[in-house]
């Protein structure tokens, strides 16, 4: 059956979020190294560890897991949008979570300095916001696909944060006929419901769409669950799990068109 629509994940599929976060950590941890004799990489590891532990201790954790908001997004998110009451709790928790993650990270390296912890907690969001990084082939491929297929962006995350990421690269959103953010919908990938919602917006059956994403546990598992073909973009040579098998594996977005052509042959 002919492909009528292409569904894209956002983070680490079209936007290189992992690199943006890494560079923000490097800049912030290097600032800390100006104050104390520490290894910035060790501080980054400590803050990531403390942030994850804190994040998973909150009563909001099951909700953030369902929506698909990770601990490091929490280090720069404001959580000012979203109708669910959990977003108001996250909005309230965010300042102390961000401060405590950095303060505890410093403490793990033997540094008791709440003032510096607060400074770093305020610096990290600014550093992350200054780094909207797009993969080099993103616009080339979207330009190639636009007009041939309906395009839908299907992204997990907090509404305000995902919109902010898109605002940082303003030429990206206009390529899409529809944009679905899990925090607005109320459930994230791999839930069947969010894929059904996408198909309804596009007016397609599962066989008429193809999902492109970098995460086996969300993009690929979810599209597999509804019988939609998919392409797992594996830029870093990751190993496949035994439980989740993509229909196709690609290393660049430039591979998309030739695979669609083969599906329609």
Q: Where are each of the predicted segments found?
A:
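Long, compositionally biased
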Residues: 74-77, 145, 152
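N-terminal helical cap/lid subdomain that shapes the substrate entry/recognition surface
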Residues: 3-10, 14-134
């Amino acid at each position: 059956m002919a492909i009528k629509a292409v569904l894209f994940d956002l983070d680490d599929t079209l936007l290189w979020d992992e690199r943006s976060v890494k560079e923000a950590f490097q800049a912030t941890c290097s600032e800390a190294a100006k104050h104390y004799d520490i290894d910035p990489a060790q501080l980054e590891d400590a803050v990531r560890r403390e942030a994850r532990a804190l994040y998973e201790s909150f009563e909001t954790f099951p909700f953030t897991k369902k929506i698909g908001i990770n601990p490091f997004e929490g280090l720069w998110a404001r959580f000012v949008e979203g109708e669910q009451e959990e977003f108001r709790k996250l909005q309230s928790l965010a300042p102390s979570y961000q401060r405590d993650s950095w303060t505890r990270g410093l403490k793990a390296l033997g540094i008791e300095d709440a003032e510096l912890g607060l400074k770093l907690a305020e610096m990290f969001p600014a550093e992350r916001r200054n780094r909207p990084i797009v993969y080099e082939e993103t616009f080339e491929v979207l330009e190639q696909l636009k007009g041939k297929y309906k395009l839908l962006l299907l992204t997990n995350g907090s509404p305000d944060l995902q919109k902010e990421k898109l605002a940082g690269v303003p030429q990206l959103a206009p390529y899409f006929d529809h944009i679905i953010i899990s925090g607005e919908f109320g459930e994230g990938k791999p839930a069947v419901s969010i894929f059904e919602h996408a198909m309804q917006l596009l007016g397609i059956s599962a066989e008429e769409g193809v999902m492109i994403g970098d995460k086996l546990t969300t993009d690929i598992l979810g599209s597999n669950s509804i019988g939609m073909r998919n392409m797992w973009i594996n830029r870093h040579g990751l190993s496949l799990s035994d439980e989740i098998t993509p229909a196709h594996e690609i290393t660049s977005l430039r591979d998309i068109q030739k695979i669609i052509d083969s599906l329609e042959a």
